Amino acid sequence: TIPRWLAMTLLFIGFVGIWQLATSMVWVSPIILPSPGETLNDLIFVGENLVTGGYMLTAFWTTTQTVFWGFLIALGIGFSLGVLVGETKFGERAVLPYLVAIDTMPKIAFAPLFIAWLGFGISSKVALAAFIATFPIVVSTAAGLYAASENERMLFKAMGATRMQTLLRLKLPTGLPFMFTGLKIAAVGVMAGVITGEFLGGGKGFGALIRQSASQMDTPRVFALILYLSLLGLLLYFTVLWAQRRIVFWQKEEQAGPVG
């Protein structure tokens, strides 16, 4: 089999080659798709601005803070609701139907409401990001609590374990792989929520810079900003993956990635 690094390198070279060919032959308008060289120049410009502490560093730090708080709030709410749904009849019968109903809605459409409720500051972006990222955590946590086999549950019951002991020593350890799958999905969702909020609600984040560059038809700058945002998303995703491999140490490495 081809090593992963070689396959990824060949795919990247092929992608950039087709991209360069399409722009040099003017198959696509430069306004729509800039050349790799133009994009690289803007990548360098944005990178220098980030390193020297310019206005883009302030914007990137604002977006990073929003992502962090949105993910942290989603983790707290999602885990709590997941335990409620997975451990209680009330949660399963009364709360879960409402959660499913809300989850079926296009959550990005709630962005104007959060802006109207919380204003144009960072709070509305954090709330939208947490709102989008909460549901995968709820579902994965509840599913993880059901993962323990009936024999294991009966064994704990026969040994006189309390409900809390069964939860902490059996259900949570067994369900951790499921929960981390939800966290990795949430890591992607929280990025979408933050950028959508910055698109619509303005502010000083990278999303606002992308909107400004797009309005000026500065496509290379838009591509460069998006690529740096993808690095932030990858950092969050691989942080969760790293935590999974440290905490769920009994799980095989190939089972821990890319999403489960």
Positions of the model-derived regions?
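Generic hydrophobic transmembrane alpha-helix motif, especially the helices
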Residues: 100-136, 143-144
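Transmembrane alpha-helices
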Residues: 127, 131, 164-196, 224, ...
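Hydrophobic alpha-helical transmembrane segments of polytopic membrane proteins
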Residues: 207-242
